[in-house]
Amino acid sequence: MEDYKLLQLETATVDAQAPPLPTKTVPVFAPPLSTPPQPNELVYTKRRRTKRKAKCRCLFFTMGMFALGVLMTTAILVSTFILTVPIGALRTAPCPAETFGLGDECVRPVLLNASSNTRNISGVGAVCEEYSEMAASNGTAGLIMSLLDCLNVGDSESVMNKLNLDDTQLAYCNVPSFAECYTKGFGVCYAARPLSPLGELIYKARQALRLDHIIPFPR
């Protein structure tokens, strides 16, 4: 019994002399406390926002002025083109059938009955009205018919084919073998060459702007 008590005392003495074991501490991270901004920081933030807004407004203003300038320049160019384009440049459409182009006009040679009163200019005008065209003077008609006769010398069909007159009575009457053509006269009708699609657009634009009385545009 005494030996057991001595053993307990020795064990307690050793335990008292042993160094304490290290303990592990776990750090606890706490969220930082929000500190109120200083007065200098508030002023700097407000100035930075003001500068951003000013830059955005300046950019929008510059882009708007650029777009406005482009639109105004386009409008000026289009208006100048509509007002100053020559009429001859817009009459580029081909002439109708049984006519041929002569400058800005489409010429239509027509045959007339010699016994009727269609040899004078008023009679030719009545024939031309059927085609919504005007009658050329006798001198002009004679020059045009003489020109056709000169072109047809040696080959009676090639010129008529080129002038889009191959299926007309005038083409047959240029051949001397048709005796019935001797009893007929001739006349010349003419009209302005048709407008091209661009010419039609410009003509309608001038009508919409009511500029016909300032800048004549014969239809």
From Swiss-Prot:
Coiled coil: none annotated. Pfam families: UL45 (PF05473). The chain crosses the membrane at residues 58-78. Residues 1-57 are intravirion. Keywords: Glycoprotein, Membrane, Signal-anchor, Transmembrane, Transmembrane helix, Viral envelope protein, Virion. Belongs to the herpesviridae HHV-1 UL45 family. This is Envelope protein UL45 homolog.
